[in-house]
Structures are given as C-alpha cells and as structure tokens.
C-alpha cells in the first residue's frame, strides 16, 4: 500500500485507491482509507475527496451505485454493514477527512441541475432562492456555458451527496426485501441527527487529527445563517451586514453552524418539491426584499434577480416520494421535536431568549417553525393529494401524526405514565404549538377525511389508518385547542387593513419588521393569521374544521364506517368450518353448485377472520372517537346506523347498488359506485347463454369438455325429433323426459329497476359436460375401485351405476311434481 513517509502525487494516490477498489475486499479497502486519511495531509486528500464521495454514495446521475447504503442490511452482509457504519460514523474516519479539508477551505462543485426542481429553475433563471444555504455559493457559467454550480466546502459537499442518496432509485438484492429502518442509510441518518441535534450539551466540536485543536468554522463565505436573525428585533439588512463579523466574534455560534447546515441540506433536498404555482405563492414581498439585499454580495457576478410573478415559467417537475423517503422524513421530524423539546425551561419564554439564550438554545426554540414547518406542510399536501389510495399511505399518515404530536417527544416526564388516559391528555402548554401550526390540524385533517371517503374501509389496513387518525385527534383538550385556534384566525380585524398582512407572512423572517409595533389585536391572533396566510396566501379559502361542511364530511364518513362495520361483521360471523363443510358436501352432490357465481376473494380472505374481527373493533372505536371530536348527536348517529342496518336484506345479503334511471338507461350514483368498490353491494350477474358454452372451469378437464360437447351436439341433432316426442307424452315417462331433457331454469332479464322473467321454451337436449368434472371422474374411479374390491366386474358395476342413476332421476321427478302445486 502507500507509505506515509513518501509523498506521492495526488494522481498516483487516486490511481492506487481506484485500483484497490477492483482487487481488494471491502473491509481491507476501508482500513486502507482510514490509514490514508490519518497519514496524508489535506493537500493530497483534496484530490481524492470527490472520487471518495462518489464511491460511497454513488454518482448523482445513478450510473455508479456506490456502497448502496439503502440496500445494505446486517442480515444480508453483516461485515460490510458494520464496516460502512464505522467508517461513516459522525466520529469516524470520513468525518475526520471532511473536517481536515474544511480547515483548509477547499471548495467543491455541486451541479445545480441535480437540485430539486423549484430551486433548480430559480437559479437557472437567475432568481436567487430564499434559503441562505445557496447565498454566495452560486457559480455562474463561463461565457457560452449553460451549467450552474454551487461552490461548497467539504462538509456541505458531503451532506448534499448524503441527502441526495435518498432520492436515487433503490437497489435491493435479488429477491430480498427488508425493513427501511434496518438499512445502513436509515441508521446513519439517525446517527447524524442525534450527533448534530444534541438533546443535552452542545454539538461535539470536530477535532483536527494533526494538531488536536478544533477545526475553525468557515470564512465569511459560510452558509451558516446569522443567529442574530432569530431574534425578533433584528432587521433584514442588519442580518446580512452583521454576518461577516459573527463567525469570528461569537465562538458559541461556531459550534452549531454544522447543525444549521445539516438541517438546511436535509430540508432542501428531501422536502423542497412542489408545483410552480406553490413556488410563486411562496414568494412574499419580504422574501423578494431579502433577495434584493443579497444581490449586494454577488454584484460582481451576472445579475441575479428576486422572483417575480409569472417567472420560472419553464419549471415543471413530477415528483412522487417513495415510502422510504417518507419514513426518513418522519425520522427527521421526530428528532426535531425531541431537539426542540429539550430546551431549558428558563429559555422557553420569548421575553428572555434574546439576552440569556445560547445560540444552541435559540436554535432549539425556532428550529421547527424556521426550518421545516412550511416545506413539510407543502410536502404533506402533495402526498395527501397524489399518494395512491392503498395501505402504503400509512407511512404518510404516521409522519403527519408525528408532527402534530410534539408532546410525544418530551424526554422528561413529571410522572411515569400510569395508563392510557394520562397519555391521551394534551397539556395546555401545547396550545401555542397547535395555534401556530393550525393548518396541520385542520386542513390536512379534512383532506384525510376526503381520502378516507374514497377508500375501502373494510380493508383492515385502511380501517387501522382511520382509527389511528381518529384516536390522535380525540385526545383530551386537543379538539378544544384546535377550535380556539380557528376562533383566533376568524377573529375580525378592525384596525389592520387586509393588504398589510403580507409583511407578516414570510416564514424565514418571522415578522421581524413589525416586531416593535404592537397592533390593537392580540399577538396570538396575529400569529395564527400569519401562519395561515404564509402557507396558503392571502386568497386562501379556509374551511373550518368544526364548520357545517366539515361536519357533513364526518357524517358521511360515519355512515360509511357503519356500512363497513356491517360488512366486516357479516364476514366475521361466517364460520370457516361451515364453508369447509359445504365444500365437502358438494363433493357428494349435496351442495348447491353455483355455475353463475364469481370469485369473491379479497384481502379479507388473506387477512384471516381474527383480523376481520379486529377491523370491526377499529371501526367501532374510530366511530366513537369521531363522536368525541365533533360532539356528534347520539340520536343522529343512531339513525345513521339504523339506516345502514335497514339496507340489509333479511337473509344477510346486500341489495343491488344504488342506481337512477336516465335516458341512456340505468346509471350508478356516487353511493352506488362506493358500494361496488367496497364490496357492500353487487349486481346479480348470471350467465344467460347456453350452459354448455360457459368458459371451462378450473375443476373441469378441458379436453373432455370439448369432446363431450361435440358428442352431445351430435346426439341432440340426430335424436331431436325422438326426444321431442318423448317430452310431449302425458304419462310419467313424459314427465321424466321433460324434467331431465329440458332446461330447469328460465332465462331472466334483470336490471336494478325492474325484474322481468319471460319464459322461453327450450328444445329437449342432453348435457354430458358434468362427466368432464374432476369430481365426477373421482366418483367413478372410487366406485369402480370399490366394485373391484367386492369382486364385481366392470359390466356389473356399470349396470349398477345405470340403475342407481335411473332411480335418482325418478326420485327427482317425483319430488319436483310434488312441489309444483305449492309453487303455483
């Protein structure tokens, strides 16, 4: 390998490492990389850093897989799994390399073309993005060039590639699928969040491997956001002018600039995906003014302008997050809540933070609204509107429920949890969070109701999701907090003109321009209005969660839950033993064969009857929770349940779907479509043609079906007159022939509106298709085997079989004749 005593050229070092990737196993390659990082100076490591990043995380275009961290699991390859985690650990060799290069202020280019669509379109049209992460980093293309790049330091470059790794196509080992939480990538995300978002103490400073001292923070070009901007008394212009002196003036701020950078990168890469309309709506006047001031720092470069209405016309992105993507974002949300809730009690009050709070404590106070609130809301809106109506939506649901329950991530509890009721009581101190995140509780909840109305609630997984959402929102005090937040938002304004709100809406600034001006209305009301308008715009149409329209949605959902409960209960009451017995009896011809039946299987068959009973319980509890949230009248709810019960036939079977008669015939209503989709009702579809021409069934021999059909056709054609004469006789022989040679069922014309059963005389004919059934063949085989055991020859067995069939035919004829007077 390479020796530290020598000083090979960077190209030779890079070439040697590339050669080792082909010839050496993974463990030895990582050990060699650790020695190289420890032994060689930053000048020589600078040349191999981009190659090493690409080797670990893969290329941005996906042509190089890298270490496939998302597909690396302990159960598949434990040696590589633990080696990769140790190498990429926050205190591991890779981070030592990052800090060593950062100390020398090396820069690395990251193509703008791989950034999320809104940011990419903004930069390509020379519009400065709002996020400070991109300020002073944009490299404009040379004359004639079209590609933009970001000049990043080693830490930023590493985090950009690490975050972008989540957006690439996942590569699983052939035929193997494991939980996302067990992958090396997911575990590393968890490690980085725990390391850079410490609950106790400060962020561990990076240590230089050569001198033992700490690595200095970046020069004034650093992307770190000035912490004075978090205060409510800092103006926009001061924010950027004072930034150049902050890095060296405030040692405490140097400790957490990596935390800021990590959060900004994760949020920008994972959540910054939305439509052009949403992007333009987010460009508030304050954001445009901020971008205008930032032009001062890039005055030597080609002009870059703030976003204007109608700009970014070329932006178009179709983004569909994966379930793994959502699970990782949920992990980020949980860590941010834990980090924010770890603030010292004396720093919770905004009146004291500006004088006594450290930068880390100040970051904890504002990390959720400043970094993630807006983009997570848009991300959730996108998922609620575009995610398929299947069970995979559970990941999105849990991410949403994690965000709206920050009280679940409080480390210190005043007393241990003694029961469910104590867990379900939301402390009053969280009312501020509910008010400042009102749309997460109201609009997203109503969108979830709309999704639930379009799903199959009999499905156990869908029923569980409705139960989970209802249980969370029925927690004690939470509905009252949401109602109070709505009342604050709807509180009439008597002094502030409507158009002045836009100065208070920018989520990046927190309304700092007008912080010294005390409006006549309450601060709480102002915060709620600012939150809603910042996310939805001035022209938003707000639907009250406890208004009449939302209440109608809940009543519709309650009715559908009652219908689904009825269906689940009828399925759970259907004993598997009775089905088995019926199938067993049908082998002996004692069952009722259904030639017109269709396949009734569904996910419920695979789930099992215990799961179906659990589904019934989930729906029952969900209905109770909705009653608690919206205070539904028990009488009204009982009437809904009674209507559902009355819609069932006495024999437990569903009626026809709801239809209306139109000029074009029968048309399904929306309720009828829902009934069919959810299996609540169905049309009685019967085969009206020649039974001999039905499709070959799985229990029939295809060759015999075809042969017997040709044989019966020849017999019916040749002896048609004879069979007709026999059926015309008035004696018992005529009755016998009519019963077995003519169709016993009449063709029926059915519709949801009318039922007409015209009789159509059928010509006498014989049917031999029953002989092609495997069941019949098995009976014949068993019969002849028993005959041979009783020393009966084939001729005698055949004669006895014919005698038995004749006796059976006579008995059937006699029974049918006895039933005719009763039927008439």
Curated annotation (Swiss-Prot):
Give the keywords, sorted.
Cell membrane, Endoplasmic reticulum, Golgi apparatus, Hydrolase, Lipid metabolism, Magnesium, Membrane, Metal-binding, Nucleus, Transmembrane, Transmembrane helix
Its record classes its membrane topology as:
Single-pass membrane protein
Q: Name one GO biological process term.
A: cellular response to tumor necrosis factor
What's its catalytic activity?
Answer: a sphingomyelin + H2O = phosphocholine + an N-acylsphing-4-enine + H(+)
Q: Where in the cell is the protein located?
A: Endoplasmic reticulum membrane; Golgi apparatus membrane; Nucleus envelope; Cell membrane, Sarcolemma
The cofactors required by this protein are: Mg(2+)
Keyword field contains NADP: no
Read off the InterPro entries from this record: Sphingomy_SMPD4 (IPR024129)
For this UniProt entry, the molecular function terms from Gene Ontology, in alphabetical order, are: metal ion binding; sphingomyelin phosphodiesterase activity; sphingomyelin phosphodiesterase D activity
List the record's Gene Ontology CC terms alphabetically: endoplasmic reticulum; endoplasmic reticulum membrane; Golgi membrane; nuclear envelope; sarcolemma
User: Could you tell me the superkingdom of the organism this chain comes from?
Assistant: Eukaryota
Identify the Pfam families for this entry: mit_SMPDase (PF14724)
Q: Which residues cross the membrane?
A: 777-797
What EC number(s) are associated with this protein in UniProt?
3.1.4.12
Q: Does the keyword Membrane apply?
A: yes
Q: What does this protein do?
A: Catalyzes the hydrolysis of membrane sphingomyelin to form phosphorylcholine and ceramide. It has a relevant role in the homeostasis of membrane sphingolipids, thereby influencing membrane integrity, and endoplasmic reticulum organization and function. May sensitize cells to DNA damage-induced apoptosis.
Q: What is this protein called?
A: Sphingomyelin phosphodiesterase 4
Protein species of origin: Xenopus laevis
